[in-house]
Every structure is written in structure tokens, then in C-alpha cells.
Amino acid sequence: MDRVPVPGNPGETRWNNRYCQVETTYWNIADTVVDPERVKEERERLRLERNARDRKRYAEKKAAEQARREKEQERIAAIERLNTYVKKCWAVSAEPIKNETGIVSVAVETTGLDGYDELLRVAAVDGDERLLIDVMIKPRYVDYWRDAYEVNQISRADVADAPYLADVAAKIKGILLSGHVIAYNSWFTEAYLDVPGVEIDGVKEHIDGYTGLAEISEQYGIPYSSVNTVDKAIATLRVYKIIST
């Protein structure tokens, strides 16, 4: 129909419907006139607007895709950089310490759960619950771990003057080489203590694979603290002894 609105009549703008919230302007037939030339001009204007809108959406989509690719590339680069650093740290020469119990129960705290996260604290006790190490570690690359802080309560200030992993790797490695290493969550702990020649026995896997240390400790009446890494290592050892008898 070759009709257009009467000049100066704005019409009524409203949503198409609740599911397609796009504004459309409507006019009563009485508010329009027959004008083929103006209809042609209006159709051309709408076509140009639609094309411009489509080009803008396409450009925004491409920009978003590029941003995602760049972010993923940065993530991969961060993981590779950290892996190179950690591998170099654990390659250090170390002799096993004297450990007559033959057991090392270890617990760790980290900046998170992703491949680019780092150690914040390592604690270990021997089979008689004697402390072998309890050390804070300053992350080499990660400088923000708000989500992890809610769990482990280790702040940036807590590790500001702490040694880097490279400074304590030899000591940690010597301890881990001194006996049968156990941790409650082996897959998690191994990701951060990936020391050549060291295999970590997961206590959790000997139970059911999903019960947490806090829950199992309560079940057996074992003292437990979610923010004390040494307590976690001791609790892990006690659970291990119970399920091993």
C-alpha cells in the first residue's frame, strides 16, 4: 500500500510483544495519505538503516569474538609461562630428608583452581604428626585471588614477604622424597606439587571419591580447620590411618 503518515503525525510506538521487545510505530489509516514517491523514499531510508544496523551488529560480533580469542590466548600463554617456571623449580636437586616414619602427609593452599593458579602455602607432617614444613609462598605471577581468600583466608599481605617457590622448592622436594606421600585430594595436590619422582596417594579416593575432608573429619571426631593448612595435613594423616587399619 502506497500510504505514508501525514506529516507531523508521530504515530504510536509500542513493543511488538512480550517475547520480541522491539519498538514499532503504528498509525491509524486515517492518519496516512497516498504518496507513492514518499513511500519509495521511506522504504529506501529503512533499507539503509537496516543495512547500517546489520553492519554494526556484525562488527560488534566480530569484535567480541576477537576479544574472546585474545583472552583465551592470554590464558594459554599464562599457563605455559607458569608451567615452565614451576617445572624449572621442581627440577632442582634435592636429597630426601630423614623421615623414620616413612610417611609424609601434605596439604596445600592455592590462589585458585585454574591452570594458571599458584601455591600460597604448603604444610606437611610425618607419620607421627611432627611438623616437617609449613611455609607461605609468594605467587610468581598471580596477584589477585579474592575467591580463594574466602576459603583459605590468605591475603596478599600475608605473602608479601614470603619466599617464591623457587626459593623453597628444594626443601619441599626433599621432604616429599622422604616417604609415602599422602594428601586428601591427590588430583588437586599433584597439580601444584608435580615433583619428579613423587607420587601422591589420595586419601579421598580410598573413601568414596567425593566426601570432603571437613565432613569425614567430623565423622571420625578429628579436629579440623578450613584455614589451617597444618591441621589439614594432620587430619588427612589421621583419616588415612583409620581407613588403613
Residue ranges of each PLM-predicted region?
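Short linear loop/turn motifs
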Residues: 2-15, 163-166, 226-236
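Short helix-start
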Residues: 3-45
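N-terminal accessory regions of nucleic-acid-interacting proteins
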Residues: 32-102
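Conserved non-catalytic scaffold segment of RNase H-like nuclease domains
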Residues: 85-198, 216-224
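Short, conserved alpha-helical segments within structured domains
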Residues: 185-189, 209, 229-235
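C-terminal folded domains that constitute the principal catalytic or ligand-binding module
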Residues: 195, 213-245
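Short, flexible loop segments at boundaries between secondary-structure elements
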Residues: 200-219
